[in-house]
Amino acid sequence: MSSPDADQTAPEVLRQWQALAEEVREHQFRYYVRDAPIISDAEFDELLRRLEALEEQHPELRTPDSPTQLVGGAGFATDFEPVDHLERMLSLDNAFTADELAAWAGRIHAEVGDAAHYLCELKIDGVALSLVYREGRLTRASTRGDGRTGEDVTLNARTIADVPERLTPGDDYPVPEVLEVRGEVFFRLDDFQALNASLVEEGKAPFANPRNSAAGSLRQKDPAVTARRRLRMICHGLGHVEGFRPATLHQAYLALRAWGLPVSEHTTLATDLAGVRERIDYWGEHRHEVDHEIDGVVVKVDEVALQRRLGSTSRAPRWAIAYKYPPEEAQTKLLDIRVNVGRTGRITPFAFMTPVKVAGSTVGQATLHNASEIKRKGVLIGDTVVIRKAGDVIPEVLGPVVELRDGSEREFIMPTTCPECGSPLAPEKEGDADIRCPNARGCPGQLRERVFHVASRNGLDIEVLGYEAGVALLQAKVIADEGELFALTERDLLRTDLFRTKAGELSANGKRLLVNLDKAKAAPLWRVLVALSIRHVGPTAARALATEFGSLDAIAAASTDQLAAVEGVGPTIAAAVTEWFAVDWHREIVDKWRAAGVRMVDERDESVPRTLAGLTIVVTGSLTGFSRDDAKEAIVARGGKAAGSVSKKTNYVVAGDSPGSKYDKAVELGVPILDEDGFRRLLADGPASRT
């Protein structure tokens, strides 16, 4: 129970959490979806740590859709077909100091004693890729995505010279039936420089750094473009494997090399923390001797059995950590400070600087966050400023070189009106550091982002309606807001250059858009909820609400307490839902969609038996035949509740590979635990299958 003082500060804590979670999510969007981050790794890590600390102090704020519970790009639209990983593809926790590394090693020692050895490998600054081989043949390649579902980039991956089409069998290591191997796609520095030189010759903009160029090259729609770019890959881990059970990660790497897969030459074993520190210190001094960019050293427990014992959190394994090196710094001239309006109305100032080389790439722009941060840093327009690239990747302004001032510098004045729509700017609540544009309905900047969100993969997943299409529709005044999307006609689309051919006819993409909009009208209710851009409502909360209430009208009519009582929702999301439906123009959007034929009820397939009616089931770990979303939808379709946490009310826990803490909680509470076969029997026959 919270103290009286805590109760009094609860509203302020909630506001602080909402602002922080929103800021983290916006930066995740810019990093994973746009490939155009505006803050440094260090700044993002600090934001995430502040959010984690706040949720640690107030666990009731931690929702399934919180950025602390999600991996990478969860919840954002992508350009390629979604595919499920056979086993979760997690991120890594970071250590920035010797003390943080020692604390991690201490936790390992407390759990497994002196039994662990440590594998040290370079942290390549590239793009994560997962390869699946069946009977030795490459059948799929996919990006990390949200850790469970990634983008299918198989055709592009096949153009990478390091990726074999078939594995080479060996006497010591027979090729396994199924092999899911993880690695990093990157550019060697000389290949990156050659690519940028060719782009400049063609009159195109060069890439800012090798990581961005690797991401852009891997995501080309035309594999021939990818093939012309000299991408490389190094493997650094396993996912789901059938027919091969290595005792150590070191042994797994030997097998990968024997099969013809690329493995780093710079991987070493250490017996203790002192050996780990020696490797970290060595590469800290010699990092620029490597032919590709690195931003640290990854340290992993080598023994596979100990890895299983240590388990993982919802986003990262406990048996591995990435030690990141201190950033590099440079000086340059701050030419101007300009502001940008984000999708939630937050006004962000940006530093525009004389381009300068830092850590191997050219930097000319960086975020300054807000007016308070500019004041804290003490920077003036015209200053010589110190910039750094945390993790050798993303730039940040540290502060001015005061002794170089000549009196011509001037103070930056935050605008009082929105640069997009001219509305007066103000903090949303007293005490907020950020100022916002309150014109949520009419601000072009916010409107563009909302239209884009409607079509996102976790929204209504409407192909063709990407960012460019949304901008074209708004600029041509074909739509006034997202409410008019589903009333679009061929005549409307012909008013835009984007969807009109030179002959004045509707383009192929225009025809596809109309077909896809019509298909989206029949989307499940939870997708409609996500598409409405209700703050904090992601797929998990949307599914829970759709299952509990069955229709959008019932959700709108529910009280905040009723909404909060739904498992997976809680008070923060409930308050956001109530506030959203209290706004007149929000309800107008719902009415427009309803009039256009968008389905507002959660229709159930009557042919599916309700074998799980009244049961609460938790799924943990990776299942072979189900993605996490598939398993949840199978439970809900049969009348059950797919919960996110284990409690005394839980009827069954379904445990796949690497189940984590939910498995331990089930054992502690005596909740029945099913493997995947048991889960299939439960779906088919209900609890009777357990007797």
Curated annotation (Swiss-Prot):
Reactions accelerated catalytically: NAD(+) + (deoxyribonucleotide)n-3'-hydroxyl + 5'-phospho-(deoxyribonucleotide)m = (deoxyribonucleotide)n+m + AMP + beta-nicotinamide D-nucleotide
Main EC class the enzyme belongs to: ligase
Notes on how activity is controlled: Inhibited by pyridochromanone.
Keyword DNA repair: yes
GO-annotated biological processes: DNA repair; DNA replication
Pfam families, per database record: BRCT, DNA_ligase_aden, DNA_ligase_OB, DNA_ligase_ZBD, HHH_2, Nlig-Ia
Listed Gene3D superfamilies: 5' to 3' exonuclease, C-terminal subdomain, 6.20.10.30, BRCT domain, DNA ligase/mRNA capping enzyme, Helix hairpin bin, Nucleic acid-binding proteins
BRCT domain ranges (all copies): 607-691
Cellular component aspect of the GO annotation: cytosol; peptidoglycan-based cell wall; plasma membrane
Enzyme Commission number: 6.5.1.2
One GO MF term: DNA ligase (NAD+) activity
Cofactor(s) of this protein: Mg(2+)
Keyword line: DNA damage, DNA repair, DNA replication, Ligase, Magnesium, Metal-binding, NAD, Zinc
Keyword Magnesium appears in the UniProt entry: yes
Binding site for Zn(2+): C418, C421, C437, C443
Catalytic residue list: K123
Domain of life: Bacteria
UniProt binding sites for NAD(+): D41, A42, E43, F44, D45, S91, L92, E121, R144, E184, K300, K324
Function as written in the Swiss-Prot or TrEMBL entry: DNA ligase that catalyzes the formation of phosphodiester linkages between 5'-phosphoryl and 3'-hydroxyl groups in double-stranded DNA using NAD as a coenzyme and as the energy source for the reaction. It is essential for DNA replication and repair of damaged DNA.
Family that this chain belongs to: Belongs to the NAD-dependent DNA ligase family. LigA subfamily.
Subunit note: Monomer.
Name the UniProt record assigns to this protein: DNA ligase A
Gene: ligA
